Design a protein with these regions (language model features):
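Conserved structural core of kinase catalytic domains
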Residues: 122-171, 252
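C-terminal lobe substrate-recognition/regulatory segment of protein kinase catalytic domains
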Residues: 137-143, 252, 259-266, 332-398
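Conserved catalytic-loop aspartate of Hanks-type protein kinases
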Residues: 293
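Protein kinase glycine-rich loop
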Residues: 65-73, 77
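Glycine-rich ATP phosphate-binding loop
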Residues: 54-56, 76-96
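Catalytic-loop of the protein kinase fold
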Residues: 189-207, 211-246
């Protein structure tokens, strides 16, 4: 877990200066607490999760459940054996209420579109998005469930960063990850017309270098675990061991989880992204597009390089400002004021800003910059040891292309792929 950097506040309920107060990456997670050992029993009710036991089979006996990989807001995920092709797969079983209700998600349609386009496209980015292998419906006591089948992957990047000092990945690795993510996003945005809307470390997974051998070894060494509560199988977080990314011959990431993804011209929701990775236009209720994924990526690159989450927010203890207020303040402190034309487009602007463009509830802003976050005088902002002085301005320019408050001036994935920093 990324270290929390805190210093004493100068007075009760005062705002800590951004350069002295950053939150851990856990602040970016969803509200359902995915790091709980086991999901709550009431998730297994009408319209909810399907109860699964080890050994259960699905799709006319094709898939046999071997272990549990975990769960999320809309699904449980299981390690299963495909009896037809004799290989291990990840079986994702959606909640029954994901479809057939008043507000269906788009995941099934989006994954189908990804599969169709991937089969026809020559775009390099298709290799960095997790493909759908199969899908089917399953009838259970809580309703009808859509089920997806995927390749089994290794660790997510949140787990990987925790293995490095101060949560900092080697610059060479970050460069590789950045390029692969940009290729994946360009494929999604331009060829598929899909916006992920939830790009974060736990949705970026590493491929296994030898899947069948690695999984067999794990299963032989680690016994299955079952909860004593309600007979629900415990999730096995990080079920498949993965080497350090810096020691992998050719690290290969995959963007996963399209459960809250949207079409470019049809949005699932206007409340998107993990809070600390949320684009400014989303917070103020302005129109958003594929550039929200680019903003999230910029935040992640800083996180991977420096081990900090730059735009996390905290509410005041006495209620004088909200998490959103604080996050907007940090954005202004690092990147400057919001353009008036963007503020005019937000249907929530009046909740946060006065008519002069200043924040309503926070006035003690302390100006800083991207440069000071990457090449500052104190930890955690000191320059990475493996980044040269000459590289600093090039890297800052790369970040600035992603972390621009006005989304119309934010660069696209295709434009960022041409940046000099990726070739250094």
């Amino acid at each position: 877990m990324i270290t929390t950097f805190k210093k004493a506040l100068t007075r009760v309920n005062s705002r800590a200066w951004l350069a002295k107060f950053f939150e851990p990456v856990s602040q970016t997670s969803r509200s359902f607490h995915p790091h709980q050992t086991i999901e709550e029993a009431d998730f297994y009710s009408t319209g909810g999760f399907h109860p699964v036991s080890l050994g259960d089979t699905f799709n006319s006996g094709t898939y046999k459940v071997v272990r549990k990989l975990g769960y999320g807001q809309y699904s449980t995920v299981w390690l299963a054996r495909d009896s037809k092709v004799q290989r291990y797969v990840a079986l994702k079983i959606l909640r029954a209420d994901c479809y057939g209700g008043s507000h269906d998600i788009f995941e099934r349609e989006i994954l189908s579109k990804l599969s169709t386009i991937s089969g026809k496209s020559n775009h390099e980015g298709r290799h960095y998005v997790l493909p759908l292998l199969d899908q089917f419906k399953h009838e259970g006591p809580n309703g009808q469930h859509i089920c997806f089948v995927f390749d089994v992957l290794g660790h997510h990047l949140d787990f990987q960063t925790a293995k490095y000092e101060n949560g900092r990945l080697p610059i060479k690795v970050v460069r590789t990850i950045a390029r692969q993510l940009l290729l994946g996003l360009d494929f999604l945005h331009e060829e598929c017309r899909i916006i992920h809307t939830d790009l974060k470390p736990t949705n970026i997974l590493l491929e296994l270098e030898n899947p069948e051998k690695t999984i067999e070894k794990y299963l032989s060494e680690v016994p299955a675990r079952v909860s004593n509560e309600c007979g629900i199988t415990k999730p096995l977080r990080e079920v498949i061991r993965t080497p350090l990314i810096s020691k992998m011959r050719e690290p290969h990431i995959r963007i996963v989880d399209f459960g809250v993804a949207s079409w470019s011209d049809n949005h699932l929701s206007d409340v998107i992204q993990s809070p600390a990775l949320r684009a400014p236009e989303v917070t103020i209720g302005a129109h958003w597009d594929a550039k929200v994924d680019i903003w999230s990526l910029g935040c992640l690159i800083i996180e991977f390089v420096q081990g900090i989450v730059p735009f996390s927010g905290l509410a005041s203890k006495n209620g004088s400002w909200t998490v959103d207020d604080d996050r907007l303040a940090r954005t202004i402190e690092i990147l400057g004021n919001f353009p008036p034309e963007l503020l005019r487009k937000g249907n929530r602007t009046a909740e946060f800003f006065n008519t002069d463009g200043g924040l309503l509830r926070i006035s003690d802003l302390s100006s800083t910059s991207l440069e000071r976050l990457i090449d500052g005088a104190e930890r955690p902002f000191v320059k990475p040891n493996d980044m040269s002085d000459a590289e600093i301005p090039v890297f800052i320019d790369f970040l600035r292309g992603m972390l621009t408050i006005d989304p119309t001036h934010r660069k696209s994935a295709a434009e960022l792929l041409q940046h000099e920093w990726l070739r250094m």
